[in-house]
A protein has these predicted regions:
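Active-site-proximal mixed secondary-structure blocks
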Residues: 1-118
Length: 118
């Protein structure tokens, strides 16, 4: 996917938290990632920084797949839950579903995606 200069979709990277979704040894998981950066327009590339001792890192290492969901302005609670707990001990997806957040299955990868995210 190419993102031409001044494309409206690029503006979503300015201040949004990235929610990284995975599905692997730790099950379906979501992690808040402040370090989600738009690095190229053509091709459209995103860089994320994930610590090596995180459940998300292990899920990605095992499956080679992850989803990047950019928080919408009404998803600050989701960001707090995703960033405040470890996926190795807590099922954050189920907790967020109980809070009313919705998810869907991605078309090309096995990671769960967040409904309403950019």
């Amino acid at each position: 996917m190419d993102l031409p200069w001044n494309d409206e979709r690029s503006n979503k990277f300015i201040t949004n938290v990235g929610l990284i979704t995975t599905n692997g040894p730790y099950g379906a998981d979501v992690m808040a990632c402040e370090w989600t950066h738009h690095v190229s327009y053509r091709p459209g590339l995103i860089a994320v920084c994930i610590g090596p001792n995180k459940a998300t890192h292990e899920n990605i290492k095992q499956t080679k797949e992850f989803g990047v969901n950019l928080c919408s302005t009404d998803q600050s609670i989701m960001s707090s839950v995703a960033g405040g707990y470890t996926g190795s001990r807590y099922n954050k997806i189920n907790a967020l579903k109980e809070l009313g957040f919705e998810f869907y299955e991605a078309k090309k990868i096995k990671a769960t995606m967040i409904k309403g995210a950019a």
